[in-house]
Amino acid sequence: MSDFLNHLHIDGQRYAYIDLHKLLTPAQLHRLPYSLRILLENIARCAPVSLPAVLSRATGQGPDCEVPFQPNRLMFHDTTCLPALADFAGMRDVVAELGGDPTAVNPAIPAVLTIDHSVIVEHYAEAGAVEANLDIDFRRNSERYRFIKWAQASLDNFKVIPPGTGIIHQMNMESIAQVVWESPAADGGVLLHPDCMVATDSHTPMINAIGVLGWGVGGLEGQAAMLGEPVPIPFPQVVGIRVSNALRPGVTATDLALTVTELLRRRSMVGKFVEFTGPGLASLSWAARGTVANMAPEYGATVVFFPLMTRLCLTLN
């Protein structure tokens, strides 16, 4: 990986990063969609043994290949995380029985559990309905919540967003995503790289709205990622959508999202990346982009990607 590194300085701090100009010619890089640039950076950083095949496919010179995507974090909702936590508890028991240190058994990458699937609406249209429903949920699922509380207190790299806080893809965008991730570099410095993630929720592509590459996976894939395994996908075909103008007054982001959904449902989009481009993107807020990206599962796309732009960076600041 060191062959692909370059460095930059921000406020006197030296940072390393993967320089794609060391992998592709300027013309090749210019033609490559931004979503594939992030995917390529991920392979160069995490799975360089697969880089020749991925580079060959990315430049149109090689056959289809598998991409061993390595997320730097993942998110679960409560219905898919409990089996993973039970496995970690079991592994810790076995390690302890064999005389090892059970506290050494932890998620390999940061994992966040969002509890948003268990609350049942029994009180509504009344003051205090939210609190009443949460109280019933805590009493009904007390054993499960005790187990989750143990996991949060015992496991490194594991955090819990409690019920009543927000749904998983909302919390991902508003509170968890970093857009640019910092990791330890081999020389003891700091390596900057794109925030890449997966989550066990079909609407995870909503995070693509702020330039974070991520998509939904099944529970078993999530558990494998929690153990440091890659999430393999076929090298994706990218479908571009050019936005040439701003929305007219009275036309909402929901109108745009439904129109895009109607258009793409007429085509085979399963397993493909959709990427937005064009001068009209500058007029779309991060919330509008999120509304569009959230609809990815409605037409089968893996990713609905919006490149990071100056306006969004100002919003993040």
Q: Where are the language model's segments positioned?
A:
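Fe-S-dependent hydro-lyases/dehydratases of central metabolism
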Residues: 1-317
